[in-house]
């Protein structure tokens, strides 16, 4: 009698907690910084006019491109059994100073924690982005859950996640609302300009083979577009004021649809403006929930 085939994600090891990804250095030249802004159709001239005083601004969410380029662990054997059960849960981007056009940024990730939750195993990868002189420019916590998995022992952490701001009052009706059209080619545009390629976002054959209804927009694109909406509504169109972007990914965003970004609360604490937002997909479902943007109040 044949043994029954193993099903489900199985047991997840904590042996890789503390280990690093490759380090990847990227030059933020004008071609790339302009292309990233174009990837999300951000029409702010600050990202495109290289004749303006002070030069080009750099969209904060270029951090997602830097993370993507440095995500590899060539000396780590992948868990092929658990991989299909992994889902991206949330991100927390902390910017200590604006990225500068023309600088070289080196990005490296580290698995900083794994813990058992009721839905499965929760993990946090932390990517540090440093300038050529060693200055820490930004950190990105990239968090996921392997649904149904079991940890092989107690929770392990080499670093904690920073607390997120809390909002004293959230009104029932949105304070403001912005609609963002998602064209037929939005995912291809983001793929090539942001340098983030996964065929479920560009090839219907691959997306449907993976059980999706069609190609879907990258979650990082949805967050970047949402940040642009918040910047334009609450920060006078000045993305250089942004110091933090948090959010949880939820529903899928399809092509030829609309993302609706809604501001739910605003507050200023010790000179920092904080905005709570959400993004809805074309079906009215949350695409980004518990979205938070922080930045200099003026």
Describe each region flagged by the PLM.
Residues 2-15, 19, 86-177, 253-256, ...:
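HotDog/MaoC-like acyl-thioester-processing domains
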Residues 2-88, 151, 155-161, 168-233, ...:
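Hot-dog-fold acyl-thioester-processing enzymes
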Residues 26, 144, 178-182, 247, ...:
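Generic detection of short hydrophobic beta-strand segments and adjacent strand-loop junctions
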Residues 84-92, 240-246:
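Short, structured beta-strand/loop micro-motifs enriched in basic residues and often containing a Trp
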Residues 201-268, 272, 280-285:
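Catalytic-pocket segment enriched in acidic/His residues
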């Amino acid at each position: 009698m044949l043994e029954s085939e193993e099903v489900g994600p199985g047991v997840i090891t904590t042996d890789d907690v503390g280990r690093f990804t490759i380090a990847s250095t990227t030059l933020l030249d004008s071609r790339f910084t302009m292309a990233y802004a174009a990837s999300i159709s951000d029409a702010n001239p600050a990202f495109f006019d290289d004749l303006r005083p002070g030069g080009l601004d750099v969209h904060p969410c270029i951090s997602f491109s830097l993370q993507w380029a440095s995500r590899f662990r060539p000396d780590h054997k992948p868990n092929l059994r658990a991989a299909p059960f992994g889902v991206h849960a949330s991100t927390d981007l902390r910017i200590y100073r604006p990225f500068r056009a023309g600088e070289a940024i080196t990005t490296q990730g580290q698995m900083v924690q794994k813990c058992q939750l009721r839905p499965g195993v929760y993990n946090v990868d932390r990517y540090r982005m440093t300038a050529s002189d060693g200055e820490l420019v930004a950190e990105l916590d990239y968090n996921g859950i392997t649904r149904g998995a079991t940890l092989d022992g107690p929770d392990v952490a080499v670093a904690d996640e920073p607390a997120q701001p809390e909002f004293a009052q959230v009104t029932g009706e949105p304070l403001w609302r912005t609609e963002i059209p998602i064209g037929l080619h939005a995912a291809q545009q983001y793929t090539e300009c942001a340098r983030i390629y996964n065929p479920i976002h560009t090839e219907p054959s691959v997306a449907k083979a993976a059980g999706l209804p069609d190609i879907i927009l990258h979650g990082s694109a949805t967050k970047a577009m949402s940040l642009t909406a918040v910047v334009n509504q609450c920060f006078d169109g000045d993305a250089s004021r942004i110091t933090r972007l948090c959010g949880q990914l939820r529903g899928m965003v399809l092509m030829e649809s609309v993302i609706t970004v809604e501001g739910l609360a605003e507050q200023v604490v010790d000179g920092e403006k904080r905005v709570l937002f959400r993004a809805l997909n074309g079906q009215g479902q949350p695409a980004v929930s518990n979205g938070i943007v922080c930045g200099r109040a003026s």
